[in-house]
Amino acid sequence: MRSFVFTGLLLTLFCVHASPSAPQTDAALWPANPTNQAWPVTQPLNPPEGLRPCCAFGYNLKAEALGVPVPFYQLGNVIDTQHLGEHHYNDSNLGAVTNLLGINSEKVGLIYTRRGGFIDLAHVRDTADNTFYLFSQILPQLGQRWRIDLQPELALRRIQFTEFTAPADPAERYALATYLAGKLAFQLAAWHEIAQWYGFQSVPGFSEGVSAFSPEDLYSNLLGAHLAIQTILTGHAQSVSEFNQAMTDLLPTALAQLDAVSVTETRVQFDLLDGNWWDSHKRVPEKFLVLKRNYDTSDDRLPTPVPDETLPPQRLGLPDNIDSYPLSALAALQLWPGSDRGTLPPSKMYFTAADFAMLALQARSADAQQILQKR
């Protein structure tokens, strides 16, 4: 992957100088009401550098390479709210390396929550970062026709922005840019699940099919969008360091609201689902190490229901409209397949979020047939 030189963090002031409020921890699971404040904002950021390396569903996972078991390797995969570490905006490949080596102060892993099911912290953090990145790009150009091109995932990922009359009020512009960024960041996450299923490999020769549509993935991504929106709307997008600190503070509170459990209890939940949701006898990256998948790509969703859980699930959703502005009319994620399109079906020119349900349904049907053939 290309490495990016990080841009300076000079502040552009959009309104009066005011101290940002603390993230609203009592409302962490649902984005705050549109702000009446246009806070100072960092200069446009470089995009996050790839995705954090985590996690196949399960724990103490073994691995193989080219069909040969890798000895003495186990992926613990489980974390609790006491050991989340410090959030770091992922603008360097160094973050991925330090995560793999276990020396990053930011921690990732899976945690079971009684109201949100399993949560993958890498997915939470990745979508939070993408929301912050997109917000920093969108706000200065809100209402203009322009585009962002991102690194390919089976297709060139392009966000095309539409020309429109943006709100005159700075606070309304700030809120509109925030929610639009969260919406698009979640769509990028949904496409990543689709791309993994249809053959995307971030490391050539290493299949990512095991991770595609994993039951916890997109709910975790949606949680990340929520937390970033909350962080931005409460004035913590003034610099990368301030965003990092706000996310560090907000994440454990959000997990507590979802009734997160201990490492031991998370492992117990995995054990109860062994043979139904995952197969502890298989190795990463065998696709059917994961037996249970969630093919819903909507940004209004419940967690994948875990058998015998008695607490009511927490629904998460993103708005389709802010005031009189339909978000889908302001920007569109376009996926332009190139020569390396995996097994993606033919498209007219490009895919959009409107095609996600169809692509996911085809994946679900194919997986069901494969599982039947293996029985």
Annotate each language-model stretch with its function.
Residues 1-4:
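Positively charged n-region of N-terminal signal peptides that target proteins for export
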Residues 7-14:
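Bacterial N-terminal signal peptides
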